[in-house]
């Protein structure tokens, strides 16, 4: 290759403010990138202090204002390696470094459900895998209910965050009847239509085989609930003190629910209570420090990222108590901004969830 002409050399020198400045700028950029990645790894280590719990069929209870929450552990699910289930829009190297920093390379996480005693009713949020479980490690919400001394027929209302089988499956019995015979089942109309139609899961990182399984199981479970479903939409108050919030991306009709002060139905009151964030994210140790990392189960990844960033910012500002679908059980606490990574977050678990063993 020919050496730069004097004219080109002069242009490069002027553009950089001097050749040394070009070199220094490149070094500074590299150092900045390395510093940012180190901050991300440190934030992952901080988030990883909260560890997934083993076992299944457990229950504990605590009170948040006038809401009694019973946290149920359906079990532990395994989606394979961390990458590409998390961070497919990043790089494999960065995600694997984060996994090593977290001390876990597998995509393992808890599956949670909750019962709320609120306004004189017993309300179930999601139902775990139920009889659709792929193995004995999940499918134990009913065991948790027994530990809490709650019978299925005592549940007055069920609120479904979305139609993935680890949330929907436990709402029906093995012979495909409603598992909670006296309850109405609340969900988004768009979610029902999605699973009853021809769901497009092509933007997920889930294998084609498992996509087909999710479609078949989702439709089968939805069919079993026909005639018992009440549809809700963004901003609806299906019960006094309960408000639905549309948080699409994970699925088209993915909903959050807030449970506010007794008898209240305004949005402000709902935000002052406790909120279920569904599958806003799966693996808090990676996606709280890096909310812009794609979730492999998101139907619409870009929307999922935007909604995750929006909701996390709101929760950090409000300090509203949250319930979660997949954070380490019991998965109840608050979200705050990370002190290590400015655009990251940290989960602060609630204390005092007393384990129940009534049998």
Segments from the language model and where they lie:
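Bacterial N-terminal signal peptides that target proteins for export
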Residues: 2-11
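C-terminal motif of bacterial Sec signal peptides marking the signal peptidase cleavage site
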Residues: 19-21
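Metallo-beta-lactamase
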Residues: 23-150, 154-157, 181-184, 188-246, 265, 271-279, ...
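Active-site environment of divalent metal-dependent phosphoester hydrolases
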Residues: 57-58, 80, 132, 163-170, ...
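Active-site neighborhood of phospho(di)ester-bond hydrolases with catalytic His/Asp-centered motifs
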Residues: 124-127, 156-163, 186-188, 246-249, ...
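Active-site metal-binding motif and surrounding structural segment of the metallo-beta-lactamase
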Residues: 135-186
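Cap/insert and terminal regions of metallo-dependent hydrolase folds
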Residues: 258, 262-359
